[in-house]
């Protein structure tokens, strides 16, 4: 039913757009094939692609629909809330929906979960064994808490994959969701990237018939100084190698070089700002904090996260 409605609505929207938004010359040019209007059926006062600032939305809580969401206290809840945000907001636009640097977004919630699990183990251990040395308890608690957080990451990514590939939007399709990752250097930031890649590699489905899912599309943010060739001398070698292993088994991740040549690398080298792709191929031009389209001074930095575009010819 959603697909049928979408086909009818898209045809109506396309005709309304031609009637009320295009000049006679533009309509003739489109008819003759000189121009092509991308996504004409969905361009009536809607957002095309965006770099959604999920981290800022979750911080301190937010209101969505008729419900107030408190900021997640732990990692498992953060995954649930992030999934709700993506499904709700991506359905209100028609282009690519990107969650930039998702590893850094989930990092603080993983830290909170680790502390919870660590204290949980220590409380139980103290009640059971009074004579054991505190440092032994501490080592065991660290392993217990780390393993629990790792499992939370695995289950969280599995849940995200299930949501994004099973819950269709009112447009009659599944939102084109992209996540960029690979630059977080902390213990749990790296764990976020590695588990995302490993879960995608394993795929979803019945045992023996699993296959990689379409969404989220994964884009690996490659920094030569951090990832290098994957040897141990680089701080993010394990993340890089997880990406290589995932690429060998699936179509993802896409690789975006931040230290090579071109516009994206230029923004990163000069400002340390990431230009994540919106969906699959669209990159925003810079908008500066003080100067707008052009930098006001040498200290003026571009903003990318939290912005969107309105379509193109």
Predicted segments with their positions:
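Conserved catalytic cores of very large enzyme subunits
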Residues: 2-313
């Amino acid at each position: 039913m959603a697909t049928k409605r979408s086909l009818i609505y898209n045809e109506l929207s396309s005709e309304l757009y031609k009637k009320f938004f295009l000049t006679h010359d533009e309509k003739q040019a489109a008819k003759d094939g000189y121009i092509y209007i991308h996504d004409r059926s969905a361009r009536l006062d809607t957002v095309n692609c965006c770099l959604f600032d999920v981290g800022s939305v979750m911080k301190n809580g937010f209101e969505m629909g008729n419900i107030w969401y408190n900021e997640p206290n732990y990692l498992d809840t953060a995954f649930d809330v992030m999934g709700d945000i993506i499904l709700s907001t991506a359905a209100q636009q028609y282009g690519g929906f990107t969650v930039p640097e998702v590893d850094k977004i989930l990092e603080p919630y993983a830290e909170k979960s680790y502390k919870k699990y660590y204290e949980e183990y220590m409380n139980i251990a103290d009640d059971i064994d009074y004579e054991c040395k505190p440092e032994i308890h501490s080592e065991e608690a660290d392993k217990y808490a780390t393993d629990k957080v790792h499992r939370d990451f695995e289950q969280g990514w599995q849940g995200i994959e299930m949501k994004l590939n099973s819950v269709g939007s009112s447009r009659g399709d599944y939102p084109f969701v992209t996540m960029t990752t690979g630059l977080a250097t902390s213990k749990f930031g790296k764990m976020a990237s590695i588990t995302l890649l490993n879960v995608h590699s394993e795929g979803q489905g019945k045992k023996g018939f699993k296959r990689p899912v379409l969404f989220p599309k994964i884009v690996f943010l490659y920094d030569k100084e951090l990832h290098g060739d994957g040897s141990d001398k680089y701080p993010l070698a394990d993340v890089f190698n997880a990406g290589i292993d995932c690429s060998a088994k699936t179509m993802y991740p896409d690789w975006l070089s931040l230290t090579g040549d071109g516009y994206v690398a230029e923004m990163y080298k000069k400002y340390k700002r990431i230009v994540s792709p919106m969906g699959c191929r669209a990159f925003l031009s810079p908008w500066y904090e003080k100067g707008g389209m052009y930098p006001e001074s040498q200290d003026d930095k571009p903003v990318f996260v939290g912005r969107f575009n309105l379509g193109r010819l």
